[in-house]
């Protein structure tokens, strides 16, 4: 039996763990589902501390649990957690800029909820520069019961797939 060492698999090229899609690889109507993520008390506390959202409703669990049944999660945290699932899987290494984002909250999200999202490509638009394009998407975020808790519409600038002549060693 042959053993494999790190040197055996080493190369000069980095191997991306998550590689995003280029602008040219998307089609309007295409849909992608993220993995699921449970929102924990620690997530809420860290977000409140970083964002400065020191609202009584988020800080005092006892004051809101009677009304909602559990501690509420700010909509901004829900959105950022979904961005944290979308960006590494669809846009890693290809996303250049978030150009526009609009969120609509439909139902409350609470500590202990598990969320995921479906990303639907709604628009593909080239830019003046041939190395990039704009992707529009509608993101539907659902909880563990399948209830849509938030929808987002975004526009992002992505790079296009490099032409073979642009890749080092490719045909000229």
Predicted regions and their residues:
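Conserved hydrophobic positions within beta-strands
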Residues: 36, 82, 105, 119-121
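Mid-chain, well-packed structural core segment of small domains
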Residues: 92-99, 104-111, 117
